[in-house]
Amino acid sequence: MTPNDTENAARPLPEGAVDPAQDAAGAPDTLAPAAQADAVAALEAEKLDLKNKLLRALADMENLRRRTEREVADARTYAVTNFARDMLNVADNVRRALDSVPVEDRAAADGALKALLDGIELTGRDLAKTLERHGVRAVEPQGQRFDPNLHQAMFEVPNPDVANGTVVQVVQTGYVIGDRVLRPALVGVSKGGPKAAEASKPAGEAPKPAGEAPKPAGDGQKPAEA
C-alpha cells in the first residue's frame, strides 16, 4: 500500500457519499433490458426445441409400437405359409383321386370301394377345414370377373353369350392366406362376348346418334296466311 492509499483510507468521506468499494460489493447483479430480452428469447427457443424433440420421440415410439404389432400379427398369420403351400399339393392329389372316378361309378359303388371313396372325400374335407383354421382359403372364381391379382389365365374360350373376361373354367383351385395370394387360380377366360359393363347394363331405349338435334314439337313449317 502506498502512502497515498493510506492517506485516502484515513481521510473521512464527505457527508452523503458512498464508498465505491462497498457500493460495488452490495449492488445487485442486474442485466440491462436488452440483455434480459435476449436471455428470455434464448430460454424460449430452448424450450421449443426440447418440446419438438419430445414430440418427435413420442411419435417415433408410437410408430415403433404400431409397426411391432403389425409385424407380430403378420408373423402369426403367415408363419405357416411355406407349410400351407406344400399342403396344397396334398389337397390337389385328394381331389384328383375323387375326380378320377366317374360320377355314375361313384354313385353305384358299394362295399369296400364306397368306403374308400367316402374316406378320401372325408380326408379332403378335413384338410380344407384345417387349412381354413390357419387362415388359408380356397379361391373358386367360376363365373366371376377375371382378376389378375387372384387368377392366372391359361387359355381363352370363345363365347359370345358370356361377358368378355369372365372365368368360364377353373383348371386349378387358387388359395389365399390372410390378404396374400398363396397360389393363383389357373383359369380359362371367355372372349368374343359383350364387355362386362355392357353386359350388366339393363336393356332400354337405344341411344340417339350423336349430333342429332331434337325435333320441334310442331312440323316446323310456317302456317299459311289467310
From Swiss-Prot:
Keywords: Chaperone, Cytoplasm, Stress response. GO terms for biological process: protein folding. Gene3D superfamilies: 3.90.20.20, Head domain of nucleotide exchange factor GrpE. It comes from the Bacteria. The keyword Nucleotide-binding does not apply. Residues 1-31, 189-226 are annotated as: Disordered. GO terms for cellular component: cytoplasm. Participates actively in the response to hyperosmotic and heat shock by preventing the aggregation of stress-denatured proteins, in association with DnaK and GrpE. It is the nucleotide exchange factor for DnaK and may function as a thermosensor. Unfolded proteins bind initially to DnaJ; upon interaction with the DnaJ-bound protein, DnaK hydrolyzes its bound ATP, resulting in the formation of a stable complex. GrpE releases ADP from DnaK; ATP binding to DnaK triggers the release of the substrate protein, thus completing the reaction cycle. Belongs to the GrpE family. HAMAP family: GrpE (MF_01151). This is Protein GrpE. It comes from Methylobacterium nodulans (strain LMG 21967 / CNCM I-2342 / ORS 2060).
